Curated annotation (Swiss-Prot):
Official protein name in the record: Holo-[acyl-carrier-protein] synthase
Family: Belongs to the P-Pant transferase superfamily. AcpS family.
Domain of life: Bacteria
Native organism: Clostridium kluyveri (strain ATCC 8527 / DSM 555 / NBRC 12016 / NCIMB 10680 / K1)
EC primary class: transferase
Cellular component GO terms held in the UniProt record: cytoplasm
Cofactor: Mg(2+)
SUPFAM superfamilies linked to this entry: 4'-phosphopantetheinyl transferase
InterPro entries named among the record's database cross-references: 4-PPantetheinyl_Trfase_dom, 4-PPantetheinyl_Trfase_dom_sf, ACPS, Ppantetheine-prot_Trfase_dom
Length: 134
């Protein structure tokens, strides 16, 4: 069953500025695997913005905000065909595991000015009182 839905939109211009002005931005937000992927794409701001939006959308689908974990606990990967996938680590994974088996569906897109990501989290069980059937 669907546990949560998250969507995030990011201005590519703001991500470009963050990359140019803050040497630590990429290292603070992305894992080594993600950085390698982004460097292979010359750190193009639209790709960085898409991955950033994806992390935000995943957090929203978890329904927790960044409580107890950080950006690197959510890794955005891709299949051989290019479909984006989510790998949860650390406390983000522990949080998702509370609901048994889970799957996160992810879509990322960008235009000239914005990048957007949409995440849907499916779980086996829901124990949160806010989510019980009436």
């Amino acid at each position: 069953m669907i546990f949560g839905v998250g969507v995030d939109i990011v201005e590519i211009r703001r991500i470009k500025e963050a990359i140019e002005k803050h040497n630590t931005f990429i290292d603070r937000i992305f894992s080594k695997n993600e950085i390698e992927y982004l460097k292979n794409r010359n750190l193009r701001p639209e790709f960085v913005a898409g991955r950033f939006a994806a992390k935000e959308a995943v957090v929203k689908s978890l329904g927790s905000g960044f409580r107890g974990f950080d950006f690197k606990d959510i890794e955005i990967d891709r299949t051989a065909s290019g479909r984006p996938t989510v790998v949860l680590k650390g406390k983000a994974k522990l949080m998702a595991n509370k609901y048994g088996n889970y799957k996160i569906h992810l879509s990322i897109s960008h235009g000239v000015d914005n990048a957007i990501a949409y995440a849907i989290m499916e779980v086996d069980k829901i124990e949160d009182s806010d989510c019980k059937d009436i």
